[in-house]
Amino acid sequence: MPHNNDKKRTNVSRACDQCRRKKIKCDRNQERNICTSCQRNGERCKFERVPLKRGPSKGAHKASDPELKLSSNKPSKSSLFEDSNSIIRPKSVGEDSNMDPLSRHGSNTPILDNNSNSGINDRNMGGIDDRLGGSTDPGTPSRSGSILLPPLGQYPQQQNYTNNSTSASNNMLNSTSLNSTILQQQQPFWKVPYHEFQNQRRGSIESLQSDLSVRTFNPQDQLVYNTFQQSPIAMKHSSDPTNSIPPNTKSQHLTTTSNIGSVVGANDLLSGNPNYWGSVRAGSFIPNGDENDDQIPQNLQRRSSSIPSILRNTSTSILLSQPQLPHPTNGAGSTSNNFNNTNDNSNLINNKGTGSTAGLGNNIDNAVGSASPQAQRQSQQLYSYSQFLNQSKPYNNQNFSSFGQFSTNGFQSRHGSITSEAMSPSTALGYNQNNSNNLPGANNPNISDISLLPNKESDPRVNDSQKVVKTEVSNDIFQFGEQNLANTIESNADKSEDKVKSGGKKGGKVPRKRKTKQVKESNKKLKVNKKSNFDSDSINSPKVPTPVQQIKTGFQYGQILDVELIDLYYEFIHVGFPVIPLNKQTLTNDILLVNTHPYSNIHEVNSYVILWFRNSLELLVRVALKRKNDSPFFDSHNTPGPLRSASGDENMAFNDTPKKKDITSSHADSISSGDDNGMAEVQSAFISALNECFQRVVDIHPKVRENKDRISPKIKIIYLTTFILLNYILALVGYDNSFVLGMSVTIFNEFKLYKLLVLPYKAICQDSEFSFNAKQSISLDDDFIENKNIGNGNGNRTNGSTPGEPNNDEGENALTNFNPSKEQQNSQKGGSGEGNENQGNQIRSKIGKAVNIEEETETNENYTIMFKRLYILLTMFDSLQSCLFGGPKLLNVCITNTTEKFFSGTTNSKWNIEDSLVREKGALISLKLGETLSEIASNRIIMNHFDIITLTNNNQANATDIVFNLKKLSNNRDYDNFLQENKGLELFDQQPLCISQLFHKMLIMKSSFTYQLLSLMDANNGNFVNMDLKRLEQIVESLCSLISVILQLLTLIMRLNPTNSIDLNYRPVTPTQRMEDMLSNKNTDSTDSISNSNKTNSGNDFYRRLLGLEHSNDIVYSDISRGVISPFAMAILHESHNIHELIKMTPTILIRVVMTLNVQDDTGNSVNNNATPGDHEEDMKLKRANTSQDLVYKLSNSMNDVVQIASLLSMIKPLKLFDHGFKTFESEDVLQGNDEDAKKRQRPVLKRLFYDTTNVPKPEAVDPLVVSLVNTGWNLLDDMELGFLPQ
């Protein structure tokens, strides 16, 4: 540390660092630059240790400071504000009992800058002095230089609206400047109180370790308050409460006689009042008599947080960086509020101040139809998803987040608190010393009341007075966050330039004249985008991040509008695999409409769950977005706004960047070119974002489990769906993270969801885990409850009904939409009048009982279908991970045929997974593929028979089991049964609908071909069977079909989405009415034309089909999957490569086998020589010759397809962040032969496990071609058993 020259000690006068550490004498002098000890030990004789401070503390010289003497000579309390340098940290008598321990042990006293309070004069100090109470509390001694901050009921009032009174506005401005000054000094030492509604903090999710989060407030505590707070109690003590209220809202500004709180009118929000949240942030207490058990007055209660460190960063640090939607209020012109302290299942909107409520959906248009246009726009923003289809999407206009009502800007109980939950009391906060009016967006009502601090490294406009104080935050805050990747890339060049220009000094100021070209261009962009960045409604300005953005993770959420997130999901993701197994209308108008208002007892749990569901969905969308060549992965989204679909510069996509290459272009090029460093950065950013998102969801689980009986089933569905989204991301990028999957399985099992699949319906109704009992559930007949529209054999909705529309033939929901007269008419049409009438009476009596069931109970019963679907989806992802990486399954519940039962055609169309019938079929086919993968993973031989493998005397039985399991899997007609039960899907057998359909068929054909090859060897004795023409014909047919399906699959991928990413310029086609009619068997005449137009071989029309050239009159169903991403893309690519590598030489081998059989037949040694004397031998020979010729022709075409498959595999590059590479197989040249050692090395794994060559007799004469085919079968079995990816 620096010292004066006269006081600086020479190195000779003290021991060197090494001698001091060893506590020996140092003999270094001016003649010798090294001491004897260091010279002998070969150590460096250095003096780098900073000498300890000696002498008395600074406090002993306090009286010698003239400025402090000046302050101490004035005993009056108004003298506290004469000089800012005289402000010191106060201590009260009761500090040891009431103060925070961290604040009691502060050592240094911060001194304010002289410039921070230069505008404060004596007159203003008098106004502040009046607010402080006018007299000193007897319990607090008046000492020199201390700050007596007001108690809870007397903190300064917030500046509300326009300056209607000069004195009121001046006092408020001075109060703002003073408290800003006090905040800069005192914040690290004070436990800042925050206020909330009565006793609502006791259920906070932030007190996971303890619910005792409410502490009694001591009036003697010295507190610091945010200048943006507004208290209804402070309004009482102000001289004229109406001065700060505009004239048009005076009639609506109501203050209760008990001074509990004030009700903010609807016009406050519509007029752009930035203090609309004041009643929430300042702690306006809502009457709640249920939990008002404390004897202490509510205005004397103080809330303290016992937040775990990992959750401190959750509710504010990452939340503050996202836009916020204003709190829902009453309709336009209404001033009354109806509060409900129970956990409602849907948000309700009050109609013009009356007590009636109206559901959100189509009725909301009527509720706001008579209001002004501004009120209508605001009403559309009150609720998140009820107006999804009608919400406007301005580019640089209002950018309210639809999830804003879920406290995306932090829990509403934290509003108004200076100290963030992400910071400890001893952590300094970077606070802007300028007036709040100078902050960007300070007068913008749509931006949260938080200072937007410019980044001094990325924003050249920042001067010295605006530099942010660097803080040391606990490691657990950065546990799952890294520095912003984009900011790091942009600031690296600036940092390097700063070091060079400042002579290597860190933080040196760069001269204005020596700015680089990049910095000038950055300034130019800032000037151009100044209006859009600062005047827009988005809090996420790319160049002016919040303080939280400077210290938090590199993945910044909230950069895509919530409406766009839902639209993008249902357009590009849902058809490929319904990770959210529900249609868009039900999701937006029912599931996501939950109670997240602050007066709810568990509103923070609801807000937290929905927030991270939204963030998980954004993470999925941004990872899947197609990356341009000049943009670095998903962190290149620098411009908030809607995603554009049209082409052109003005309609540039969301993740597009300007054409001019900037500093980040080299980084983007390195990533796109496969540079290891660039890919490592991308992987690091992705893993950080995924771990953070997953950790936040897991952190809330104890609170969800604790309140599982009070939490709405909607919240449970959203919470569990978040885990499905994260596992989808893992499958999409090919990331093997067993921790995410394992924890997801654990949480699903804690919800006991497996009982819904394994227990009978009546047992489920009586299980307390699902809130059912004997009175709540009416057990109808099993066939009535489990009635699916697929029961009539067609699997289609009657009359093509869609969710939300009544079904005219059968009741969509027998519990609510039952029509006795309609059923009586149906029973009369049945012919058997008496039997139908009795049956109708029985059903009518049961439904009559069910009508009296409460709505919540009925909803819980209907939600069980969602829990079943989510558990099935998790099982599918578990199976996919097992097939990819070869690990064991974690969930062993059988899900065979669950797609038809729980996903296809439920009784209530509200719960269908898709509105469109064609798109629904595409999703069902993907789910059917998940069933097949689950069956493959569950029936893996190496997992089920590992206990028998070690028995050497039972090898032949094991081989028999292998053949049996292969035969069972190859004969699995489940896919064909699925096509037969769902009439209309036979159209897709001729024309594939999606890639999942062809991949499903490829897996089944692979199993069949493997069985055909292994059947050439007798499992009992290990001998090879003789090859005949009939057996050879079966093998050739199986091989050609497999190769044809692989080529068709890869061709379809090339046409639909070769990169498996979301391209906004390549969108799916909306299904036409003709497609819907044909699929619902209304127009079966054109079925033949579709099938005939698509009967093309894979050889000649390859390039035509690759380019997607079809006749204009043909219906191309696969266009609905164009641009759609799939979680199976990684598995498809690697499995296709593995099969291609294993069978690429098989057509050549089979051609030689065919030719060998013909030669044997000509010489009379043919195996098939059982012709009767009456048969014509010439005709038989001719028939065999024709068969052989056909086989050779098919095999020749297959060889051509193999070449095309190799070309396509090199062209298809799906999105993957982790390059696992492809499996390598050693080719066995059967024509030239290999030595015995090479053959042993090439021996398949399962063959070595199940066969011991010493015990198996070797056949005398073995055809090497047949041996090669059998070894190919074993290799295919290894691929199925050990995983698609290399281990």
UniProtKB/Swiss-Prot annotation:
Positions of region (Disordered): 49-152, 235-255, 288-308, 321-379, 412-467, 489-541, 636-675, 789-849
UniProt DNA-binding region: 16-45
Cell compartments where the protein resides: Nucleus; Cytoplasm
PROSITE patterns: ZN2_CY6_FUNGAL_1, ZN2_CY6_FUNGAL_2
UniProt-recorded Gene Ontology molecular function terms: DNA-binding transcription activator activity, RNA polymerase II-specific; DNA-binding transcription repressor activity, RNA polymerase II-specific; RNA polymerase II cis-regulatory region sequence-specific DNA binding; zinc ion binding
Chain intervals with Basic residues compositional bias: 502-517
Keywords of the record: Activator, Cytoplasm, DNA-binding, Metal-binding, Nucleus, Repressor, Transcription, Transcription regulation, Zinc
One Pfam family from the record: Zn_clus
Biological-process GO terms, alphabetical: glucose metabolic process
Compositionally biased residues, Basic and acidic residues: 456-467, 492-501
Taxonomic superkingdom: Eukaryota
Low complexity bias spans: 69-79, 329-351, 370-379, 432-446, 789-800, 821-842
Compositional bias (Polar residues): 105-121, 240-255, 295-308, 352-365, 412-431, 665-675
GO cellular component terms, A-Z: cytoplasm; nucleus
Gene3D superfamilies membership: Zn(2)-C6 fungal-type DNA-binding domain
InterPro entries in the cross-refs: Carb_Metab_Trans_Reg (IPR050797), Zn2-C6_fun-type_DNA-bd_sf (IPR036864), Zn2Cys6_DnaBD (IPR001138)
Family that this chain belongs to: Belongs to the EDS1/RGT1 family.
Free-text function comment from the UniProt entry: Glucose-responsive transcription factor that regulates expression of several glucose transporter (HXT) genes in response to glucose. In the absence of glucose, it functions as a transcriptional repressor, whereas high concentrations of glucose cause it to function as a transcriptional activator. In cells growing on low levels of glucose, has a neutral role, neither repressing nor activating transcription.
Name this polypeptide is given: Glucose transport transcription regulator RGT1
Organism: Candida glabrata (strain ATCC 2001 / BCRC 20586 / JCM 3761 / NBRC 0622 / NRRL Y-65 / CBS 138) (Yeast)
Lineage, highest ranks first: Eukaryota, Fungi, Dikarya, Ascomycota, Saccharomycotina
